[in-house]
Regions:
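Solvent-exposed edge beta-strands and adjacent loop segments
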Residues: 10-79, 117-128, 169-178
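Short amphipathic beta-strand/extended segments with alternating polar/hydrophobic composition
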Residues: 31-38, 106-118, 156-159
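Solvent-exposed loop and beta-edge segments used for protein-protein assembly and interaction
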Residues: 62-66, 86-90, 132-134
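Mixed-charge, glycine-accented linear interaction segment located at domain edges/termini
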Residues: 119-179
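Beta-strand elements of well-folded, non-transmembrane domains
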Residues: 72-78, 96-102, 116-122, 142-147
């Protein structure tokens, strides 16, 4: 039986095991536009620069981010697809539930949300094949990306307002203070 600091050490070695995504929904302007779809959220990749240091040292520049892109693959040609494709700036809210296995062996369902400010990158080519469903991928140029897991903000990246906040630390704060 572990007690005191031994127990704290053991408990600190456990991470909740994040399981499968159970379901997802997509909203634009508070209106449901898609359900149980495949979503690719943006990668956030800092621009890099080369420095001379015993040759070349390549490091990220935390004030510059490569273009962010997201995609949603939706079944069917419907009003939800039309609303996603409108060629105007929009905020897309994505909600999903995931299974989590906890240290005591119990399972809980955890809610996650992502908010994207984006514009459609175009109208996708539609697949129309008798006897098969129409699967269509909408892609978006993203300027703002915010992620919440279990009610806690994980990150907020806002290229237009120079915000790069990860885990509560704003890495662009010093840049904004000088501008």
């Amino acid at each position: 039986r572990l007690v005191g600091s031994e127990m704290c050490i053991r408990d600190s070695l456990w991470l909740d095991l994040k399981g499968p995504i159970l379901a997802d929904t997509v909203y634009i302007g508070g209106t449901l536009v898609a359900k149980d779809v495949t979503i690719s959220l943006p990668a956030v990749t800092p621009v890099t620069a080369d420095f001379k240091a015993m040759g070349t040292y390549t490091a990220p520049i935390l004030g510059q981010i490569e273009a962010m892109e997201a995609s949603i693959t939706k079944i069917g040609i419907d009003l939800g697809l039309r609303n996603m494709i409108k060629l105007e700036s929009k905020t897309i809210e994505i909600r999903w539930a995931q299974d989590v296995k906890q240290a005591d062996g119990s399972t809980k369902t955890e809610g996650c949300k992502a908010f994207l400010r984006c514009v459609s990158k175009g109208i996708p080519g539609l697949s129309v094949d008798p006897g098969n469903t129409s699967e269509n991928e909408a892609t978006f140029a993203v300027s703002r990306y915010q992620l919440y897991v279990g009610g806690a903000e994980y990150w907020l990246i806002d290229q237009l307002n120079t915000i790069l906040r990860v885990g509560g630390v704003d890495y662009a704060k010093d840049i904004r203070s000088l501008l």
